[in-house]
């Protein structure tokens, strides 16, 4: 079953020249977001640019959120990652979806109009309520932190 999410088209090229975000396969977790820029753009090494996607969403359900994640090929092959690492879209946000692109490579990266540059994934949300305690019940891990469980 698919959950309906409200989507507003902010750039008229979405739905005409470029498709609406959609799952590529039945097993896809994310939908591609596109660079809805006005002209070809070059992102210099070390530079971060905020890229419009041409859409806005309203998740509405407080039990859901959306996350904007990088596309693995862009990061691995070209050093293009998200400037904020993960974009979190709260259920009550209704503004435009923007992607912060950071070129962490040492070569300029050219972004063309409509290029797929990130993916949108919907995730369940649990709002926690803290319970103050003086001590925790013991666990196998205890206070073991970074590197505690090893690599093998």
Curated annotation (Swiss-Prot):
One of its GO terms (biological process) is dUMP biosynthetic process. One of its GO terms (molecular function) is dUTP diphosphatase activity. It is an enzyme of class 3 (hydrolase). Substrate binds at residues 71-73, 84, 88-90, 98. Its cofactor is Mg(2+). It holds the Pfam family dUTPase. Pathway: Pyrimidine metabolism; dUMP biosynthesis; dUMP from dCTP (dUTP route): step 2/2. This enzyme is involved in nucleotide metabolism: it produces dUMP, the immediate precursor of thymidine nucleotides and it decreases the intracellular concentration of dUTP so that uracil cannot be incorporated into DNA. Belongs to the dUTPase family. This is Deoxyuridine 5'-triphosphate nucleotidohydrolase.
């Amino acid at each position: 079953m698919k959950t309906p999410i409200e989507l507003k088209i902010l750039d008229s090229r979405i739905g005409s020249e470029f498709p609406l975000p959609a799952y590529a396969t039945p097993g896809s977790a994310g939908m591609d977001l596109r660079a809805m820029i006005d002209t070809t753009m070059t992102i210099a090494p070390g530079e971060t640019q905020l890229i419009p996607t041409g859409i806005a969403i309203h998740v509405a359900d407080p039990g859901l959120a959306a996350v904007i994640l990088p596309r693995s090929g862009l990061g691995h092959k070209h050093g293009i990652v998200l400037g904020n690492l993960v974009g979190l879209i709260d259920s009550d946000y209704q503004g435009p979806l923007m992607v912060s692109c950071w070129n962490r490579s040492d070569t300029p990266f050219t972004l063309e109009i409509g290029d797929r540059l990130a993916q949108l994934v919907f995730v369940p949300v649990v709002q926690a309520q803290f319970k103050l305690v003086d001590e925790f019940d013991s666990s196998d891990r205890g206070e073991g932190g970074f590197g505690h469980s090893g690599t093998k």
